[in-house]
Regions:
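Class I SAM-dependent methyltransferase Rossmann-like catalytic core
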Residues: 1-48, 61
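Conserved class I S-adenosyl-L-methionine
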Residues: 46-59, 72-77
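S-adenosyl-L-methionine
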Residues: 91-145
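Short alpha-helix
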Residues: 117-123, 208-225
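A short acidic, Gly/Pro-enriched loop at the edge of an enzyme's catalytic core
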Residues: 142-156
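A short glycine-rich, Lys/Arg-flanked "PGG" loop and its adjoining helix->strand segment in the class I
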Residues: 149-150, 170-185
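Acceptor-substrate binding/catalytic loop of class I
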Residues: 167, 197-216, 241
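Acidic carboxylate diad motif detector
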Residues: 191-193
Length: 257
């Protein structure tokens, strides 16, 4: 089993912009399915909900539809460099990554078949306003959040985090349980996870991963207090298949306690 220090060392050379170029330069099959997943999840969300994006990386795709549905969005990550990448976009910096294609496609999936430039700008500005808090986090600690944050959230989103920061099943389960502990009673967990991952790749760099599947996820969520009947899950194949994992699991879990 690898310890936390070793895991953190793996990410000292993580390049946020390289990661964005590797996975978000275009809207490929995987990104299309991710945008569809979030469009579906946010159709019936309470408008005064608070959302935590846990382990955001340098990305925004999962927050585009959320911005129109929730009251406030908090973002946390282990790396300050990832948070800075998002803050560049929030400030409208000319060197920020261009998320406009993702915003346009998200709006289309929400039902707007002819998205205008004005509508795209309005959604971007709405997301900028809803992004109110940035803080550091460590999934291996409880409490996991550092700095300015709430004690609990109505919605917690976590995209490709616990299985992508360790090669240990024990550490993966502990990290997921720590993240779930940030939910309010009767909160909602939106989880996307790599299936049967051996690694994931950013350009020439290889990062750790742990092999999990649908059964393992369900078992761990049950330990966290969610009923299997309250978990909606589907799996899509990896595309392209060479990235080190078999597929992507898209999971919505509603807690009732």
């Amino acid at each position: 089993m690898r310890n936390t220090e070793a895991i953190e060392c793996d990410f000292e050379t993580f390049d946020p912009r390289g990661y964005l170029r590797e996975y978000y330069q275009t809207i490929d099959f995987e990104n299309e399915q991710l945008l569809r997943f979030f469009a579906d999840c946010y159709r019936d969300v309470h408008p005064r909900s608070t959302l935590l994006e846990f382990g955001s990386g340098p990305t925004l795709y999962s927050l585009i539809t959320a911005a129109a549905s929730v009251d406030t969005i908090h973002v946390c990550d282990r790396l300050e460099s990832n948070l800075r990448e998002i803050q560049l976009w929030k400030r409208g910096d000319e060197v920020a990554f261009n998320w406009d294609p993702f915003i346009q496609r998200a709006l289309e999936l929400e039902g707007n078949s002819t998205v205008t430039r004005a509508e795209l700008r309005r959604r971007a500005e709405l997301l900028r306003r809803k992004l109110t808090t940035f803080c550091l986090c460590d999934a291996f600690r409880r409490p996991s959040l550092q700095g300015n944050h709430l004690n609990a959230y109505d919605i917690v989103q976590v995209n490709f985090v616990p299985e992508s920061i360790t090669s240990s099943l024990v550490a993966w389960e502990r990290a997921l349980q720590n993240i779930v502990s940030l939910l309010k009673p009767q909160g909602t967990l939106l989880l996307t996870a790599l299936k049967h991952a051996m690694y994931y790749q950013v350009q020439e760099q290889i990062f750790p991963a742990v092999s999990i599947d649908e059964t393992r996820v369900i078992q761990t969520l049950r330990k966290c207090g969610v009923r299997e009947a309250d978990v909606l899950m589907r799996t899509i194949p990896a595309s392209p298949p060479y990235r080190g994992y078999e597929g992507i699991m898209l999971i919505e879990a509603r807690f009732r306690h």
